[in-house]
């Protein structure tokens, strides 16, 4: 059995980890970094860039560079959060046929957020494979604890498109608790995991206990906001910079995708700098231009100003903490440790707000960027049997139920119920002689069904005619360990049953997933061919350089016909390198190698010939010296001439 890798698929950055020698190990990517930007770019020549390379070219290719798509995954285009994001990103967001939010490139190619996320997952998969030296097919992938069923299913679909069998979907705060608590001793304790990442926020209250020699991680309650994170903090800075520039220059930079991308990068940098300094300067020369010429942006930003801009966002993260504590039946003073996860928790204002609420300083010994991936790897180790004596008890974050008469939401499974779990409830018909019922499955906390998230609708038909209220229809909900729901409805009299795995009215159809899997496979093959072509070009380039050096050093020693053959082979190879035919490049590389060998052989022969001539000349000189007869001479003075 191969390794089950752990992947933190983040809004801003992603990370991959494996169990290695009983310890979780974060793997560096091909650039040598332990985290990878969750950014995917499509270039004009058809190349797909992922991670740092995609981020580097974002300013020059803003409409085809996709970031923060995790905020769109499993969401409808009409969602208020999606509409809010449209004005903040330079790329296109539009509605797919089923109403889902999809993204669009500058040449009108449409893609599901799952496809973009799959590219990031492929990069994580390749990173692990390069390290292990073997193929990886199984993974544990993390999601925000407050992700609903649609978002979880969409994440699983992204894994499938990337060629991964997703063995488990695990909540991010729970993963962080695993990373923190696995090797900690010291008795039972309750911890709060405050996870403020790039695009989402979660808080989980978790009890770590020793039960019969087994370390048990039980989630007592979870809460959060799937549209609150570092991106929102960045957007506040962007809005401030745009407004200040508009006041000064009378130009609205929101309408310029290139300027917007530069502002995005600058805002993120400024925010990070202000975590360690009191003031920074945002300087963007030539940010735009009008009839009077180029315009430059130069604005000072203080930590105090930044904190004022985001104060309501920080406060917004505290309310779910209060709710989670209440749901767990605890007070802040009952919490033994507070763990911070997610890059945005490096902001001093956030740390202070958390410390004030819980009444204790958060721990600083957990890496906020890596803890979630480490926890995912540990869960992978548990599933593979490599990690023993660990039990993880997670919960469903939102209540699940159906719509009943009068548009009421009737809960069947309450929020914060430990999963996996099953629950059933019996309902009846609303009209006389009703032969079918429609089961409308919902997720949420509102009393009115229409305000909750619709997951699916299906019909149970074949009910025997009877007065209203007489037939008995049993509706059963079954949540698996991934938090994904299966629903069935059964007429108790006839035993007729209808089952459905909730794929949500949104989400990808099996046909769409299969197409995307096929596209990903084709792209993997294309990527492989591209790498092989680059390798062939690099080899050819090295040979050309070496051959030219050889001509310079040895050209004067060999005949013109040898040099002519080498020059011809050089020219042919240089021509081949302008194209994309790998076979031709390799064939002409071989021809040049052979011509080069002839050059070296001729040069060596010429050198040996030169040495032979020198030896012959020395012999003649020696013989002539032997024929000389010694004689005595009398010196003749000039005055005797």
Swiss-Prot record:
Residues 606-627 are annotated as: Disordered. Coiled coil: none annotated. The modification Phosphothreonine is found at residue 200. InterPro entries: ATPase_NBD (IPR043129), Chaperone_DnaK (IPR012725), Heat_shock_70_CS (IPR018181), HSP70_C_sf (IPR029048), HSP70_peptide-bd_sf (IPR029047), Hsp_70_fam (IPR013126). Transmembrane segments: none annotated. Gene3D superfamilies: 1.20.1270.10, 3.30.420.40, Actin, Chain A, domain 4, Substrate Binding Domain Of DNAk, Chain A, domain 1. Residues 606-623 have a biased composition (Low complexity). PROSITE patterns: HSP70_1, HSP70_2, HSP70_3. Pfam families: HSP70. Keywords: ATP-binding, Chaperone, Nucleotide-binding, Phosphoprotein, Stress response. GO terms for molecular function: ATP binding; ATP-dependent protein folding chaperone; unfolded protein binding. NCBIfam families: PRK00290.1, PRK05183.1, prok_dnaK. PANTHER family: HEAT SHOCK PROTEIN 70KDA (PTHR19375). This is Chaperone protein DnaK. It comes from Xanthomonas euvesicatoria pv. vesicatoria (strain 85-10). The gene is dnaK.
């Amino acid at each position: 059995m191969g390794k089950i890798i752990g992947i933190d698929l983040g809004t801003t950055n992603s990370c991959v980890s494996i169990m290695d020698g009983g310890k979780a190990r974060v793997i560096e990517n091909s650039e040598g970094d332990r985290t990878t930007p969750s950014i995917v770019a499509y270039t004009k020549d058809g190349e797909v860039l992922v991670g740092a390379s995609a981020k580097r070219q974002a300013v020059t290719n803003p409409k085809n560079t996709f970031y923060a798509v995790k905020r769109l995954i499993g969401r409808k285009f009409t969602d208020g959060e999606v509409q809010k994001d449209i004005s903040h990103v330079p790329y296109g967001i539009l509605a797919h046929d089923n109403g889902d939010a999809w993204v669009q490139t500058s040449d009108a190619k449409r893609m599901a957020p799952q496809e973009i996320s799959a590219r990031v997952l492929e990069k994580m998969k390749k990173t692990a494979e390069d390290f292990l030296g073997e193929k990886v097919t199984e993974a544990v992938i993390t999601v925000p604890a407050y992700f609903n069923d649609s978002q979880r299913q969409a994440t699983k679909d992204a894994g499938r498109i990337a060629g991964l069998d997703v063995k488990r979907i695990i909540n991010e705060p729970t993963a962080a608790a695993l990373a923190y608590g696995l090797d900690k001793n010291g008795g039972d304790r309750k911890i709060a995991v405050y996870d403020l990442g790039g695009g989402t926020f979660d808080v989980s209250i978790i009890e770590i206990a020793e039960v019969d020699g087994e370390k048990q991680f039980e989630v007592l309650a979870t809460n959060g906001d799937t549209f609150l994170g570092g991106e929102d903090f960045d957007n506040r800075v962007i809005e401030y910079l745009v407004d200040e520039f508009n006041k000064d220059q009378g130009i609205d930079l929101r309408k310029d995708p290139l300027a917007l991308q530069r502002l995005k990068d600058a805002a993120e940098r400024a925010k990070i700098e202000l975590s360690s300094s009191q003031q920074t300067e945002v300087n963007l020369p030539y940010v735009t231009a009008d009839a009077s010429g180029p315009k430059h942006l130069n604005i000072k930003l203080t930590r105090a100003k930044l904190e004022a801009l985001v104060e309501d966002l920080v406060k917004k993260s505290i309310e779910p903490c209060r709710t989670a504590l209440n749901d767990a039946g605890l007070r802040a003073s009952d919490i033994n440790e507070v763990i911070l996860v997610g890059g945005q928790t490096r902001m001093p204002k956030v740390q202070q707000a958390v410390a004030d609420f819980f009444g204790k300083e958060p721990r600083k010994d957990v890496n906020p960027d890596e803890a979630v991936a480490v926890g995912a790897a540990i869960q992978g180790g548990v599933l593979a049997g490599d990690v023993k004596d660990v039990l993880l008890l997670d919960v469903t974050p939102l209540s699940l139920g159906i719509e009943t008469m009068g548009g009421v939401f009737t809960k069947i499974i309450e929020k914060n119920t430990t999963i996996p779990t099953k629950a059933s409830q019996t309902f009846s018909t609303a009209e006389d002689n009703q032969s079918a019922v429609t089961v409308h499955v919902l997720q949420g906390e509102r009393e009115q069904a229409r305000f909750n998230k619709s997951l699916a609708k299906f019909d149970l038909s074949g009910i025997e005619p009877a007065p209203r209220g007489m037939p008995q229809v049993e509706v059963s909900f079954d949540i698996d360990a991934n938090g994904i729901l299966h629903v069935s409805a059964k007429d108790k009299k006839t035993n007729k049953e209808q089952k459905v795995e909730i794929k949500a009215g949104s989400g990808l159809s099996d046909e769409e997933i299969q197409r995307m899997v096929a596209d990903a496979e084709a792209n993997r093959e294309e990527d492989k061919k591209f790498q092989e072509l680059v390798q062939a070009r690099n080899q050819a380039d090295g040979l050309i350089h070496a051959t030219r050096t050889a001509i310079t050093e040895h050209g004067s020693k060999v005949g013109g016909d040898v040099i002519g053959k080498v020059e011809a082979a050089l020219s042919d190879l240089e021509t081949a390198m302008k194209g994309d035919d790998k076979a031709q490049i390799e064939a002409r590389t071989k021809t040049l190698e052979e011509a080069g060998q002839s050059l070296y052989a001729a040069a060596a022969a010429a050198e040996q010939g030169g040495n032979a001539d020198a030896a012959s000349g020395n012999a003649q000189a020696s013989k002539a010296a032997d024929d000389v007869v010694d004689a005595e001479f009398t010196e003749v003075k000039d005055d005797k001439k």
